[in-house]
Design a protein with these regions (language model features):
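A common structural junction motif
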Residues: 196, 276-280, 321
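Short hydrophobic/aromatic beta-strand micro-patches
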Residues: 178, 258-262, 296-298
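Short acidic (Asp/Glu) and glycine-rich catalytic loops that position anionic groups and cofactors
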Residues: 1-2, 185-189, 207-214, 248-255, ...
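Conserved PLP-enzyme active-site core in the AAT-like
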Residues: 11-14, 18, 22-33, 37-243, ...
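Conserved small-domain helix->loop->beta segment predominantly found in fold-type I
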Residues: 212, 223, 227-270, 274-292
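PLP-dependent enzyme catalytic core of the Aspartate aminotransferase-like
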Residues: 289-360
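N-terminal "arm"/small-domain region of PLP-dependent enzymes with the aminotransferase-like
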Residues: 1-6, 82
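Glycine-rich tight-turn/loop motif centered on a GG-T
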Residues: 5-9, 300-303
């Protein structure tokens, strides 16, 4: 509808179409919307356009790894929330209990936005006959695109799959909404713009398009190495005395590693990490049996670091649990790591040719 758009906006449409074409190939998505800026912005846009005040929604609680912002955001819109039943031992929802609640209490939506997970949620077990699944796949988007994680878009109805494009998917900070249900697409398509978003920052979308095409070529190898890094590093840390979580013997099917520990050890590791400029997260939630540390391997995997480098990272992480840490020793270990050179990406030659096209 040109009445609701700016003069010249039609020049942008081919780029949106190209993004849609790539997402059709790697995600199997019929309808794609890259206008949101982040994964959290996707949640904001989707719930504002699809959900109605007074409706009922199941969410993944913060204690079970859910994104802490979901509950206040949707409740601010007048949506009534309740926590989805969860099985701590399985690191997944209790799907029998979830489906029972959906059917008995006439749940309208189930919004799952996991921040912490060492195995992808088995969302295909959710009965969406009479409800809509809003699946924030930010943490596993790259794994889905690489075919290393189930893709519910291909098997389920009444689902919107979305997420941030800068976690396991190695793109710019952006958001991506996908669905194969036309009625859901129609609810969002003409409401997001012009009501809730005016400027979609096209430089960001061009970067996303470039990253999608790059991932189509190199993403499978990258994701496989990322999962290898998580399991190799986790096994090393377990051998060195850390309590590393697993699910049925597998330390991770994602990029994350869970270390369970006391509050005192958690604080020691975190404080030392801050001093040594090591990036990790501390956690206080039931998913970690109280307290713990979360590690992510998506960045080191992009450098294509080998097992020898992972052995060095193990030594660094072991030092972090020492109250009397020798910071100079840790910094020497960090300095001994390989260069931070991006792999699983277009070559410099390809990028140079792209830049030449742009300049001309």
């Amino acid at each position: 509808n040109m009445d609701d758009n700016f003069i010249g906006c039609e020049k942008l449409f081919p780029f949106y179409q190209k993004i849609s074409d790539v997402c059709s190939r790697i995600f199997g998505a019929k309808y794609t919307d890259p206008r949101p800026f982040t994964g959290m912005h996707c949640i904001d846009m989707i719930t504002k356009t699809v959900c109605t005040p007074g409706s009922k929604m199941l969410i993944l609680s913060k204690d079970h790894g859910g994104h802490a912002s979901v509950k206040p955001v949707v409740e601010r819109l007048g949506v009534k929330t309740m926590d989805a039943p969860y099985d701590i031992e399985e690191n997944d929802l209790n799907y029998n209990a979830v489906n029972k609640i959906i059917n008995e209490q006439a749940i309208d939506y189930i919004l799952l936005a996991p921040s912490d997970l060492i195995k992808p949620l088995d969302v295909e077990r959710i009965d969406t006959t009479n409800c809509v699944l809003l699946w924030d796949c930010s943490q596993v988007m790259g794994l889905i695109a690489a075919g290393l994680c189930p893709n519910p878009l291909k098997t389920m109805k009444n689902i919107i799959m979305f997420g941030g494009t800068h976690k396991t998917f190695p793109g710019p900070a952006s958001g991506l909404i996908m669905t194969n249900d036309k009625y859901l697409h129609d609810m969002m398509e003409t409401e997001i713009n012009p009501k809730y978003l005016r400027h979609s920052q096209m430089h960001q979308k061009i970067s996303l398009l470039f990253a999608l095409i790059e991932f189509e070529k190199y993403g499978s190898g990258y994701m496989s190495h990322m999962v290898h890094c998580a399991n190799y590093l986790g096994a090393n840390l377990r051998d060195r005395g850390y309590d590393v979580a697993d699910v049925h013997g597998q330390i991770s099917a994602t990029h994350q590693i869970f270390i369970r520990c006391s509050k005192e050890e958690m604080d020691t590791i975190y404080d030392n990490a801050y001093k040594c400029e090591v990036t990790l997260n501390k956690k206080h939630k039931q998913l970690f049996y109280g307290y713990g540390i979360r590690l992510g391997t998506q960045e080191i995997a992009r450098y294509d670091w080998n097992d020898a480098a992972l052995d060095t990272i193990t030594e660094i992480l072991v030092h972090l649990s020492n109250k009397d840490i020798d910071i100079d020793t840790v910094r020497r270990l960090i300095d001994s790591l390989p260069p931070k050179k991006i792999h699983y990406a277009f070559s410099e030659d390809v990028i140079s040719r792209f830049n030449e096209l742009y300049m001309n």
